[in-house]
Design a protein with these regions (language model features):
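N-terminal beta1-alpha1 cap of cysteine-dependent amidohydrolase-like domains
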Residues: 1-92, 100-107, 118-119, 126
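A structural signal for conserved, well-ordered secondary-structure elements
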Residues: 95
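Pocket-forming structural segment of enzyme catalytic cores
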Residues: 105-150
Length: 150
């Protein structure tokens, strides 16, 4: 996936109860690709052929730690995991990242921050190695990125 191929990009966006960022993501994808992405309800068991599945933010099933656990067990996530296993791209944003962690698609677990309070700051990340991913294709090993974290 490259910037020049965005016009042909087929995108699906998952929708869960309580989600509130799926429509924002739909607008962003449509503006970027000039194509309307498919919105896929969490109870669906399959995906139409797509190049990218986005699991957006927005507090699926509630606003608390491990809220992604319920979403991660929704029928659509089996289809998302199958898509990824076939080499398809998957992007998890905010709560969507939590969902991908809860499904085991991403390693590790999420924990509460040490202060138990909302934190909003910039964090500098450094790429450890290059990965064969459309999201990191333009990055080199050792490159620093300033990322907002909230």
């Amino acid at each position: 996936m490259t910037l020049s191929s965005l016009a042909s990009l087929r995108v699906a966006i998952t929708v869960f109860p309580g989600s509130n960022c799926d429509r924002d993501m739909m607008v962003a994808v449509e503006q970027l690709t000039n194509r309307r992405p498919a919105l896929v309800w969490h109870k669906e068991a399959s995906l139409d052929p797509v190049d990218l599945v986005i699991v957006p933010g927005g507090f699926s099933f509630g606003d608390y730690l491990r809220c992604g656990a319920l979403a991660g067990r929704s029928p659509i996530m089996n289809a998302v995991m199958d898509h990824a296993a076939r080499g398809g791209a998957v992007l998890g944003v905010c709560n969507g990242f939590q969902v991908l962690t809860e499904t085991g698609m991403l390693p590790g677990v999420l924990i509460r921050n040490a202060g138990l309070r909302f934190s909003c700051r910039m964090v500098r990340l450094e790429t450890a190695e290059t990965m064969p991913s459309p999201f990191t294709a333009g990055l080199t090993a050792g490159q620093s990125l300033d990322i907002p974290v909230a």
